[in-house]
Design a protein with these regions (language model features):
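Conserved PLP-enzyme active-site core in the AAT-like
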Residues: 2-33, 37-39, 43-55, 60, ...
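Short glycine-rich or small-residue beta-strand-to-loop segments that form or flank ligand, phosphate
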Residues: 67, 252, 405-409
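Short amphipathic alpha-helical segments
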Residues: 263, 343, 402-406
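Short, conserved charged micro-motifs
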Residues: 275-276, 354-362, 411-420
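Conserved small-domain helix->loop->beta segment predominantly found in fold-type I
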Residues: 290-368, 372-400, 436-446, 467
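PLP-dependent enzyme catalytic core of the Aspartate aminotransferase-like
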Residues: 385-468
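A common structural junction motif
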Residues: 285-287, 374-376, 425-433
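Short beta-strand-to-loop capping motifs
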Residues: 269, 347-350, 408-410
Length: 468
């Protein structure tokens, strides 16, 4: 196991408040055992998400001071537009305040009721935005993605045979576009190979159907291609990114991930008619096309972050730090999804807590226990987030994977803090039988994991109060 060395120095620090187990237990009760409802100041190591939680560089902070807050024609927009075009290569660049608005603008424009949108695996907001248009969000990732022990290098690949079967069954007129999520967040942060993307493009050209990328972790995906795919080891990540996006017709992007910013996103595409319709809607719901719901200073920080994220020293450390956590857990026998992903380590809750059935939310129970005992906040990626109700029987259809995602913010935590996370999980695993399941007491009609509330089925106990 290689100890990853940080390619940066720390200039500004933020104190972290330590809490006791008793405090955290009270906070969990008040939050209905939903970690989204726990105040961030009461979290010691926050691995809920890597979205919008990264540390910006001094270069990005300097860019904030150059913000041009003109309503129309901000110079920061033109800089941002040039950077996006230089990396992604698409004709139209439409800024949004974050990725889900880019999804909303795209799907509300091109997706109609009764249509279907294939993807390797949709993430939560992507799926919700498709279904909000009364369309079907189809997950067509390769079957190996659902085997947490399978160590294929590109487990995010779309199943081309199933994609072709879907097109023939539904008809190309019912498929306005195909999405490809890079990296595949809901499948463990797994990358998609260039060969799979190229072959997807060739398949779709026969109909023709547009290909769009959910590009929020594009740099990490391209780094995996450089590491793992023959023929790319000597190519710069920027060159790999340009080739990857050349096979698509557009992309949505939450820049809160690989844009290294706290807010911002964009939609970029080639189709003139779609771009005009989307821009008209943008003006109605987000703002003028040269700011898209963002301040000029945020556009500047985003432009600079998109350049910085392609630095290979940074990417080597970024992927290496995530791998470091995963390898510490794996060596101790903690069940995780393999291979280790690009932005997060995923605990396999089915194997961690085999005594808790999926109907009692084992991944959520594990996330609750990790926060209660150690002040570490992860997020459930399982029955709560992706469970469905069968419209005929009314029974819950459980997802194949039941995981807790530990998403590591970029350039935020030291390796000592990552080691603390590993040691805490290892200790919790040794007394995992003390963790009990949860019962749902409230759920919203969509994206329920953000606001759901639970009751514990039995009081959870700890070997000793832990203050962190």
């Amino acid at each position: 196991m290689k100890f990853p060395s940080e390619p940066f120095k720390i200039k500004v620090v933020e104190p972290i408040r330590r809490t006791t187990r008793q405090e955290r237990d009270r906070l969990l009760r008040e939050a209905g055992y939903n970690l989204f409802q726990v105040p961030a100041e009461s979290v010691y190591v926050d691995l809920l998400t890597d979205s919008g939680t990264s540390a910006m560089s001094d270069h990005q902070w300097a860019g904030l001071m150059m913000g041009d807050e003109s309503y129309a024609g901000s110079k920061n927009y033109y800089h941002f537009e040039a950077i996006v075009r230089s990396i992604f290569g698409y004709k139209h660049v439409i800024p949004t305040h974050q990725g889900r608005m880019a999804e909303n603008l795209l799907f509300s424009t091109v997706v109609k009721p009764g249509m279907c949108v294939p993807n390797n695996i949709h993430f939560d907001t992507t799926r919700a935005n498709v279904e909000h248009q009364q369309a079907e969000a189809l997950d067509l990732v390769i079957k190996e993605a659902y085997d947490p022990h399978c160590e294929l290098p590109f487990k995010g690949n779309i199943d081309l045979a199933r994609l072709e079967e879907t097109i023939n069954r539904a008809g190309p007129d019912r498929i306005p576009l195909v999405m490809m999520t890079i990296t595949n967040n809901s499948g463990g942060g797994q990358p998609v190979s260039m060969e799979n993307i190229r072959r997807t493009r060739e398949l779709l050209d026969r109909y023709p159907i547009p290909l769009f990328f959910d590009a929020c972790r594009f740099a990490e995906n391209c780094f995996f291609i450089k590491e793992r795919e023959p023929g790319y080891a000597e190519k710069p990540v920027l060159e790999i990114a340009r080739e990857l996006f050349s096979y698509g017709d557009g992309c949505t992007m939450s820049a809160k991930k690989d844009g290294l910013v706290n807010i911002g996103g964009f939609l970029s595409l080639n189709d003139d008619r779609w771009a005009q319709e989307i821009t008209n809607m943008l003006i109605l719901v987000e703002g003028f096309p040269t700011y898209g719901g963002l301040a000029g200073r945020d556009l500047e920080a985003m432009a600079r972050g998109l350049q910085e994220v392609l630095d290979e020293d940074y990417l080597s450390f970024r992927v290496g730090q995530v791998r470091y956590l995963g390898e510490l857990l794996e060596q101790a026998g903690v069940p995780i999804l393999k291979p280790i992903g690009g932005h997060a380590v995923y605990l396999n809750a089915k194997e961690f807590l085999p005594h808790i059935p999926q109907s009692n939310f084992p991944a959520q129970a594990l996330a609750v226990a990790l926060y209660r005992d150690y002040g570490i906040r992860g997020v459930e990626i399982g029955t709560l987030m992706f469970g469905k109700t069968d419209p005929v029987t009314g029974r819950t259809i459980h997802p194949e994977l039941e995981m807790v995602r530990l998403a590591i913010p970029r350039r935020v935590y030291t390796n000592m803090q990552i080691t603390y996370v590993a040691e805490s999980i290892i200790e919790l695993y040794r007394r995992r039988e003390l963790i009990h399941g949860l019962a749902l007491t409230y759920e919203a009609p969509m994206l329920r994991h953000f606001t759901a509330r639970f009751a514990e089925l039995q009081e959870s106990s700890s070997l000793e109060p832990t203050a962190v």
